[in-house]
């Protein structure tokens, strides 16, 4: 087995995060770098910073800091690959169970899938980006277009619009939680 075959990214799972971001699986480059969405062409960090979801500008090397802002990071499948198309069906099946357990344990307000594929593999159904009507363990579900540069179907500005919608949903749910908890 290659030494890098064992590398993956750690989960960042604070208790009761506002948003739990769920990737499909770590890219090989990100796993080698040790940080989520580490490739400079990935639009995750740019959109996160521009959307208002965090009060400071963060880089991939500061992924661990998301917990400070009530945000979490994980993946549906933890094995890194060069492309999500290399993830096997049995890995997705095992990942569904593990992700459901993580969601039940940390109880996020919102589970946010980075990409339609992650949502489709978890729920076994198709959807469009944006807020969803279904819930998982009480959490609202939101789907972002994949922030990967390979996703040419969505421009940077469209992706930013979805991040801003996510920010607005988070703010509404935070307010509602504050009002109902006293």
Where do the PLM segments sit?
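C-terminal capping/extension of enzyme domains
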Residues: 1-18, 40, 83-99, 125-182
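Short amphipathic alpha-helices and their capping/turn segments at secondary-structure boundaries
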Residues: 8-14, 57-66, 102
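Short, hydrophobic/glycine-enriched beta-strand segments
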Residues: 18-24
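Short, solvent-exposed loop/turn segments at secondary-structure junctions
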Residues: 25-29, 78-81, 116-119, 147-150
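Short, surface-exposed acidic-centric catalytic microdomains
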Residues: 30-90
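Short glycine-/acidic-enriched loop or helix-start segments at secondary-structure transitions
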Residues: 30-33, 120-124, 153-154
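Internal catalytic-core helix/loop-beta-alpha segment
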Residues: 68-122
């Amino acid at each position: 087995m290659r030494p890098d075959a064992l590398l993956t990214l750690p989960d960042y799972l604070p208790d009761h995060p506002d948003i739990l971001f769920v990737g499909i699986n770590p890219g090989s480059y990100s796993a080698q770098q040790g940080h989520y969405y580490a490739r400079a062409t990935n639009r995750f960090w740019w959109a996160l910073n521009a959307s208002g979801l965090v009060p400071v500008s963060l880089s991939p090397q500061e992924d661990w800091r998301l917990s400070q802002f009530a945000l979490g990071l994980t993946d549906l499948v933890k094995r890194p690959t060069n492309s999500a198309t290399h993830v096997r069906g049995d890995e997705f099946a095992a990942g569904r169970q593990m992700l459901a357990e993580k969601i039940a344990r940390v109880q996020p307000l919102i589970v946010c899938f980075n990409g339609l594929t992650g949502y489709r593999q978890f729920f076994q159904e198709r959807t469009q980006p944006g807020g969803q009507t279904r819930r998982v363990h009480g959490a609202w579900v939101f789907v972002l277009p994949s922030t990967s540069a390979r996703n040419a179907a969505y421009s940077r500005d469209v992706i930013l619009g979805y991040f801003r919608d996510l920010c607005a949903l988070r703010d509404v749910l935070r307010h509602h939680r504050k009002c109902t908890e006293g």
